[in-house]
């Protein structure tokens, strides 16, 4: 099982997170807007962290030290 962090929970990020989670990956989603996590739906079984995806503390809370893959799918390069 791979550990994946998805930064950004918009249309693309939420679809990616759900697909990876459905396929058995351990997924954590980071987004600066807590309301964005509603895009994941009720069946998402991963975790979420509210914050900015380039903040070290946020990344540590998301499990970056055990992460196999990090996908940045935000609207902006610096989100």
Residue ranges, per PLM feature:
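Cytosolic regulatory regions of ion transport systems
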Residues: 1-79
């Amino acid at each position: 099982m791979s550990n994946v962090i998805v930064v950004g929970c918009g249309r693309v990020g939420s679809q990616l997170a759900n697909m990876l989670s459905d396929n058995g990956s351990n997924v954590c989603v980071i987004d600066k807007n807590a309301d964005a996590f509603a895009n994941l739906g009720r069946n998402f079984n991963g975790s979420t962290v509210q914050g900015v995806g380039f903040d070290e503390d946020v990344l540590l809370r998301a499990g970056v030290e055990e992460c196999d893959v990090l996908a940045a799918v935000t609207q902006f390069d610096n989100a």
